A protein has these predicted regions:
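Short glycine-/acidic-enriched loop or helix-start segments at secondary-structure transitions
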Residues: 17, 48-50, 71-72, 157-159, ...
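Proline-centered loop/turn at the N-terminus of a beta-strand
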Residues: 57-59
Length: 253
């Protein structure tokens, strides 16, 4: 028996056309009644949908109708129920960010890929880094820094020369962005259970902004990041094309 499907599509015409065709063929129920949510778009829309539907605990299966499709399966209109029946599930825990801005407001957000700090002015940022309350780096002079999940390690983290992490690994990637001093410091692997804290040095002279999956906070004074294990995103992939295989392919491409 086919599973009840809810379709979610980005605003791109190709995604909307695909939704119309698939809904006519397989039906389309409200998301809170669905047994699986099929996402049509690219990785950006997939992340948006995962955040939006996280309280439903419904597995999500993406088909690429966008530009970047690392989290997506190949698009096909003909065999969707069969693909869903044999799809393999990956579970991803997001990061939780708390960041205080100069006006005293503490902002909270979740990130599936990474939380990043970036300079917001012409001068390099100066950051102090602590892990679980222990000072680890007195001063990092850089364009920024980020903390990445294994699922996000092939995105901005990899572009910043951070390591690709196996899915399911109990570590997070802490990666510097264009580090000037210490010159040779690129980052570190930290336990998934750790809380990473950044304190901004000279925040008025060297303003810094934070980003959690495109949720921006300006004029940051401090920021902490930890894995949110109470939230689990369930992603479905075609057999042999899960995140582990994609991570391997990325390293040899």
């Amino acid at each position: 028996m086919s599973r009840k499907i809810a379709f979610a599509a980005s605003d791109m015409p190709v995604a909307q056309t695909a939704r119309t065709a698939l809904a006519a063929r397989f039906g389309d129920v409200p998301e809170d009644e669905a047994e699986v949510i099929v996402v049509l778009g690219g990785d950006g829309f997939m992340l948006h949908t995962m955040h939006r539907t996280q309280a439903l605990n419904t597995p999500v299966y993406g088909m690429n109708r966008g530009t970047v499709g690392f989290l997506m399966n190949e698009y096909s209109e003909t065999d969707l129920p069969d693909r869903l029946a044999v799809a393999e599930e990956e579970v991803i825990n997001p990061l939780r960010m708390n960041a205080q801005s100069r006006n005293g407001t503490v902002h909270e957000a979740l990130a599936i890929n990474e939380v990043s700090l970036l300079r917001a002015g012409p001068q390099a940022a100066k950051l102090r880094i602590s892990i679980d309350g222990h000072l680890r780096l007195e001063e990092l002079v850089c364009d920024g820094a980020l903390v990445s999940t294994p699922a996000g390690s092939t995105a901005y983290n990899y572009s910043a020369h951070g390591p690709i992490l196996p899915i399911g690994s109990d570590v997070l990637a802490l990666t510097a962005v264009a580090a000037f001093r210490p010159r040779r410091w690129r980052g570190a692997l930290v336990p998934k259970t750790a809380t990473v804290r950044f304190d901004v040095i000279e925040p008025e002279k060297r303003p810094v902004m934070a980003d959690a999956d495109s949720r921006w906070v300006e004029s940051v004074l401090w920021l902490d990041v930890r894995s949110e294990t109470r939230i689990a995103h369930r992603l479905l992939f075609d057999p042999g094309h899960g995140l582990e295989e994609r991570l391997l392919r990325e390293q040899f491409s």
